[in-house]
UniProtKB/Swiss-Prot annotation:
The active site is at K184. Specifically methylates the uridine in position 2552 of 23S rRNA at the 2'-O position of the ribose in the fully assembled 50S ribosomal subunit. Its EC number is 2.1.1.166. The keyword Transferase applies. One of its GO terms (molecular function) is rRNA (uridine-2'-O-)-methyltransferase activity. The lineage of its organism: Bacteria, Pseudomonadati, Pseudomonadota, Alphaproteobacteria, Hyphomicrobiales. It catalyses: uridine(2552) in 23S rRNA + S-adenosyl-L-methionine = 2'-O-methyluridine(2552) in 23S rRNA + S-adenosyl-L-homocysteine + H(+). This is Ribosomal RNA large subunit methyltransferase E. The gene is rlmE.
Amino acid sequence: MTKAPIAGNRTGRKLGQRVKNKKMKASSRQWLQRHINDPYVQRAQLEGYRARAAFKLLEIDEKYHILRGAKRIIDLGAAPGSWSQIAAKVTGSTDEDIRVAAIDFLEMAQLPGVWILQLDFLDPSAPGKLMEAVGGTPDLVISDMAAPTTGHHRTDHLRTMHLCEVAAHFAIEVLGEGGHFLTKTFQGGTERDLLAMLKQNFRQVVHVKPNSSRAESVEMFLLAKGFKGRKAEGDAEEA
């Protein structure tokens, strides 16, 4: 069971610690203070994960069991790599037998058992390179992609929803029957066409906000379970 972090740590730093730096902007100081006092950040450090985002995936899996039995996983928007760490462990991926392919336009340090591509996923060559690297049909496509924020809520929402749609189309093209798709989205409404497409192709579609996602954040996750297979999609188009 994924437990919420307790108010303490083994790093010698107490929760509630304040950041004192007069040269730092107030907003930056507040962000840093929140970050270093975040129990999920501290737990990630203790358990060897690259980011607190690991616990979002673990929480979702605890309820929906999307990692169980996964043999090949593709991770979109993977940097800094905490989801890829979990994926490599679950699949038993090694450098000799790669079963996890990850992509991000940001640089990402190497991980054992993970093939990493530094490239924008919107690049036309990205899907083919990922499929070649993962070495077979993936059981799970996970996406933590989000467009760089502009400060304009509607613009940020639309740009991130576009990434969700591209990731969803990719998942439908590559997943094996029974596979799952998980993507980050923002509160503010998921596009109807995207939801309709996912419901047409998957047996269960739900919105999820794990406890490890900050309460004040507009971040949510859209989970599509049980891919029906491309034959089902073709039948629907003919109908």
